[in-house]
């Protein structure tokens, strides 16, 4: 019987979308069973496979696994049918297989990489895999540089795979890197980083081109400096300085005049002395741009490239040599000498790429390993011992033996270059198969056991970004002979997306057309950003490369064990059936040994992860804004969209790109397209920001023209004595007809304009919170400290609580308060210390304030029902507060509080009461605290004491502070009340209305006095007073203190009158009436239930020192402060910010900073510097230089 045996070669290309499984035996059943105690698969899933059949995961064996959603371990059990295969053996074997569940790919993209304070961060989150249109993210958070969560959205559902969110930054944020963290269902996270800092976009770009390295054999090197304004050359003066940095070698010259030199074309000749005597760095500088040049004695480097770490005996060993200079420039036509185990084997000459190919016949090599060495063949030259001699770097490479029991091998010729998509790649395979297994059978015919063959592969998007080719055969002795190679493929996608502007250039303010081509009926995201923004900070732009990097095609293989997601798939080492003992053969003893450096087929299989099956198809698929486009657009059924956008006025280069996601064809991304916006002819006026009367300055007008033709410029000047109005006009020679009426005239009435130096308004409203609601930011003064910001946050929260309890909270008001609360939360976190406490000012060495930390904790807890608050931040603060508590229950009196009248409130209340309290402010706080605790006896006693000390003025009750300023005996206006006095009265009112049975009559008399102290914004003189005042209003707004009845208010003067209706429907409406004549008499009549308060207040203090003052310095005309000196002032422990600087009282001090003249101004007038007490603004002083 003659049996024809062929060599069966199975070729499998392993990508992220396909896995091949080959069964090399006739069998009856191939059962897939769950390896964790589960039963076998159903009979319908049995496979009937013939010899050497390959199938992919899309076949039946994969269909069994598609119902599994989590990572599982399975066993593949196979046995043969002796009758079908005419065999005499029954074989059964099991192998463990891990099946990876489907995982989506998620990426985050912001509209730009860097933001200024106060800007809005706009980001898009996208994910894709083929058969889904929506996806839900469990959690999306934004973290500041201190790792605080300042924004969070939960269970966010995307629409057609794209989610778009935005977040508003405050005007004074923490500078540094912010992180967007997206949590997926698999509990893995995706992060994206952006920066927040102060910056100014450059008007033009300067580049310095210089070699990275200069060798000691170079007599000169070239430096190119280029300045461009988006393709247009910039005219100006250029200075190039080449400076050799300091080097400690004693051989270097010490002549300081030769350290820095100015060069135009080439380096001066004395540079030869420097390079020969010492190796150092050169720094080439041009304005703010610089580059470094390294001086080296290394003239060239030889490298091995595209080398295999193993050789296979009988198959030639191929490799490549590369020779380049220190700047990685190929060295052409150079002689290289190759050695094997220190024996010369040949000379090779480099080609135009500096490369040379070599091959080694391995038929007679039996060594476990051999060493290759290549060096440059150079002539011998003489040098003095003190000289730096030219050197060339040699290369070494160690090649190990590949083990085969039958001495049979396969070798796939690798491809070092990246393969282009939509092309054919011809793969060549060399093979050498040992014929000894067939020699005992004379009926066997052998064909081509040594040689090579080739076959083509179509490089499609399915193979991107990398594919593994695995080729193997079964030797008759039972050994698997195989090899594999990884091909790098261009980052291409099945989904082709293309965007292009209709014109490459455009004018500011004109329309630009953008053509988008993609798969039909889908959504695409577009982005166009100013190129200058990208120059500020390098970011990983969303591109085909960045998307491809998100894929983990092959899981990592541990050096000890075959682990995948915690599952060990290694079969383990089994004891051999026959022990390894010395063998006696032909009169000699042979000892079995092994070389652990040999490669083998098992390592190839492990690295290619052929035990892992994946049922996932991972196909990779206004007006000077810094971001022009950030939109989601729909593509029609034709697969295209023509869009029109108004070009911003910025003269710059816009970079636009887009990506699309489609459920049928997957993900696609376009290449970047640019639009250059320039003005061929324009003017620019260089003038100071502002000038004062009687000052003079030179008005400089720059005319820019990038036209190829001459442009007529007219200069008209009529010399007249006195003041002259200057008008600069840029116009074209195109004429057009004007309307009959000529230019339309419009009268502008500014809100804050003082008409004829007189402005008086009467305000009418039915709810005391009307003004506070209209001005949720209720202070006119700066509020940069943590103490003031916390009180302001609390105020907004109490306003919302009051409106909610009185059923007046609208969506518009809630949205506004939500926005302000997020900004306030960001600001408050900037005062948080690393231990969880809060300080009044942000300084790294600041000590936490117990009072401020407690207030912040309480405020943020109340804010939880309206905005997101990081629970970890609250826990950290609570732990710190607990550490400050004494065993008696009292707290340490640590930290600082900047309102002197509030400091005594930090003592333990009950201990203070028992020890005898005489301070009226403490009486008020104790009364409120005991009222909240329900201790009526203590409250009654304290209120009686307070009632005796209250001045009862016209049935209006209030409480003065102990050291009050003197007031006029017969004041014309209601006296202005200091912060401590107002706050003390607020606490008494809180105590009254917080009792079990509040005395509303008594409380209304306090409310009338407090209402007279409210400012035009609905607040009081400081944040602390606003906080306490709004607490009582919000807490007991429903108790009937503020009327809901109908009121009619008549405001009249000579010859005119106005009537206002105030009722429950418009109780929050602020109604105004402007006084247009003065002097005059006006009458206000109120009918019904309600009150109207008109107030003007002033104050003159008597204190010798202030708690916290604000310094407001006005700049001289034509001058601006230097940022470096401002930063030095900010770093001092007394300063928080530079525009309105808050100063803690410690001692008399000065705060110098530098200014520079940006515009030339003559007869400069002095600029005032104003200092005022934050809490009592009446204490102020102004100085003139």
Swiss-Prot record:
Q: Which InterPro entries match?
A: A-macroglobulin_rcpt-bd, A-macroglobulin_rcpt-bd_sf, A2M/Complement_sys, A2M_N_BRD, Alpha-macroglob_thiol-ester_cl, Alpha-macroglobulin_TED, Ig-like_fold, Ig_E-set
The transmembrane segments are: none
Sum up the protein's function in the record's words.
Is able to inhibit all four classes of proteinases by a unique 'trapping' mechanism.
Indicate whether Secreted appears among the record's keywords.
yes
Pfam families given for it? A2M (PF00207), A2M_BRD (PF07703), A2M_recep (PF07677), MG3 (PF17791), MG4 (PF17789), TED_complement (PF07678)
Q: Name any GO cellular component annotation.
A: extracellular space
Signal sequence, start to end = 1-21
Query: Could you say which protein family the record assigns here?
Result: Belongs to the protease inhibitor I39 (alpha-2-macroglobulin) family.
Q: Which UniProt keywords apply?
A: Bait region, Glycoprotein, Protease inhibitor, Secreted, Serine protease inhibitor, Signal
Name of the featured protein: Ovostatin homolog 1
What gene, per UniProt, encodes this protein?
OVOS1
Sugar-bearing residue positions: 80, 155, 347, 452, 725
Which superkingdom, per the lineage?
Eukaryota
Q: Does the keyword Cell inner membrane apply?
A: no
Which Gene Ontology terms cover its molecular function?
serine-type endopeptidase inhibitor activity
- Localization per record: Secreted
Assembly, in brief, is: Homotetramer.
